[in-house]
């Protein structure tokens, strides 16, 4: 089992540690609800160093990424980031990821931990068609720290006191110095709050983590585990691989058409997406329960006549709303807000209804 560069800090802080994506990761510290609330009201610090980190380099790098990903990398300038997908030819999703354009010939990619080896092999498999492109895996060398919450940017400026990070726009990034090392500070995140994700060499990770914790102490900053990371992303309706998206899911039917640029030219999976887009059959919806029955992944979703419609993708008790919420894969005829849905839990049916995403409106 792998450990991140911050593992010793988590252990000393009394974190509950679990195996996630082959890494020993903190799932919670003080408790999921307290940590979730801290991010929504102040700021929290996440170790997400289990995520995969790739570099794509060379004069053919942009053309390679334009072919391999669903979004339009031609729209990016130096210092911009983009949410995108890797697709299979049949239109299913290999992974969702973020691409960062350092310059026209140098690109950084952050992929899901559980898909890292699969993604690397998938990209490697297609390199042969593009001259002068190198793919490098830097996952073992880099840590990824996320600072998220309404107080996050003020805390960041107390560490980077020269204004190096001031005014970073969403989905933009800067390369800045810290302790003699270069770090990438990107205005991205998985919580719906203001914040950044910082890619830092392992040997500087603990120093940066401690500096951010100290800088945020007056604001009540807390370390946040993967448990609260999941409830935060679900309140925003953000997809998680293996839940809302997978190999069988078309982005057209997963509320991800906005990152599937069918008009940009050919890319892997485009033809299949075009075919689905002509007549999509299903979609992912958000729903809220009227009773305190918490939806869980895999629960069957029914209509009012008790006809099975699909299944729950994700579900939890929302710490912000204090109501059970979830996402479900259903026929498109059931996507309108207010449409009733039913779950069967231990032989009893509970009513909910489709609601507009996100569940919680944030920054």
Swiss-Prot record:
Superkingdom as given in the UniProt entry: Bacteria
Record key words, sorted: Aminotransferase, Transferase
Swiss-Prot/TrEMBL GO biological process terms: glycine decarboxylation via glycine cleavage system
Keyword Transit peptide appears in the UniProt entry: no
EC number: 2.1.2.10
Gene3D superfamilies: Aminomethyltransferase beta-barrel domains, Aminomethyltransferase fragment, Probable tRNA modification gtpase trme, domain 1
Alphabetical list of SUPFAM superfamilies matching this protein: Aminomethyltransferase beta-barrel domain, Folate-binding domain
Annotated signal sequence range: none
Reaction catalysis annotation: N(6)-[(R)-S(8)-aminomethyldihydrolipoyl]-L-lysyl-[protein] + (6S)-5,6,7,8-tetrahydrofolate = N(6)-[(R)-dihydrolipoyl]-L-lysyl-[protein] + (6R)-5,10-methylene-5,6,7,8-tetrahydrofolate + NH4(+)
Entries under Pfam families matching the protein: GCV_T, GCV_T_C
GO molecular function, one term: transaminase activity
Assembly and binders: The glycine cleavage system is composed of four proteins: P, T, L and H.
PANTHER family: AMINOMETHYLTRANSFERASE, AMINOMETHYLTRANSFERASE, MITOCHONDRIAL
Function: The glycine cleavage system catalyzes the degradation of glycine.
Protein name: Aminomethyltransferase
Organism for this UniProt entry: Prosthecochloris aestuarii (strain DSM 271 / SK 413)
Taxon lineage: Bacteria, Pseudomonadati, Chlorobiota, Chlorobiia, Chlorobiales
């Amino acid at each position: 089992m792998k450990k991140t560069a911050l593992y010793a800090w988590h252990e000393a802080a009394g974190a509950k540690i679990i195996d996630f994506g082959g890494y020993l990761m903190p799932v919670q510290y003080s408790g999921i609800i307290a940590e979730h609330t801290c991010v929504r009201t102040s700021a929290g610090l996440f170790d997400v160093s289990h995520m995969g980190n790739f570099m794509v380099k060379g004069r053919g790098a942009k053309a390679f990424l334009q072919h391999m990903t669903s979004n339009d990398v031609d729209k990016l300038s130096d210092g911009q980031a983009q949410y995108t997908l890797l697709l299979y030819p049949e239109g299913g999703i290999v992974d969702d990821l973020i691409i960062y354009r350092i310059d026209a010939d140098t690109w950084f990619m952050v992929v899901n931990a559980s898909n890292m080896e699969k993604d690397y092999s998938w990209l490697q498999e297609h390199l042969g068609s593009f001259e002068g492109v190198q793919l490098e895996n830097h996952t073992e060398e880099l840590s990824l720290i996320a600072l998220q919450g309404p107080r996050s940017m003020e805390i960041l400026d107390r560490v980077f006191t020269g204004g190096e990070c001031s005014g970073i726009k969403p989905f933009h990034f800067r390369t800045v110095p810290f302790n003699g090392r270069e770090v990438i500070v990107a205005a991205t995140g998985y919580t719906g709050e203001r914040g950044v994700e910082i890619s830092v060499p392992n040997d500087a990770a603990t120093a940066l983590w401690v500096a951010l914790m100290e800088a945020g102490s007056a604001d009540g900053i807390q370390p946040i585990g993967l448990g609260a990371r999941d409830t935060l992303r679900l309140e925003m309706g953000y997809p998680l691989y293996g839940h809302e998206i997978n190999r069988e899911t078309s982005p057209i039917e997963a509320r991800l058409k906005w990152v599937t640029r069918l008009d940009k030219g050919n890319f892997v999976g485009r033809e299949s997406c075009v075919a689905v887009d002509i007549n999509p059959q299903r979609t992912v919806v958000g729903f809220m329960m009227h009773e305190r029955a918490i939806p869980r992944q895999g629960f069957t979703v029914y209509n009012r006549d008790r006809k099975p419609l699909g299944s729950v993708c994700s579900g939890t008790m929302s710490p912000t709303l204090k109501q059970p919420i979830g996402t479900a894969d259903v026929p498109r005829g059931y996507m309108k807000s207010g449409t009733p849905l039913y779950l069967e839990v231990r032989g009893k049916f509970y009513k909910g209804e489709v609601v507009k995403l996100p569940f919680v409106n944030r920054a």
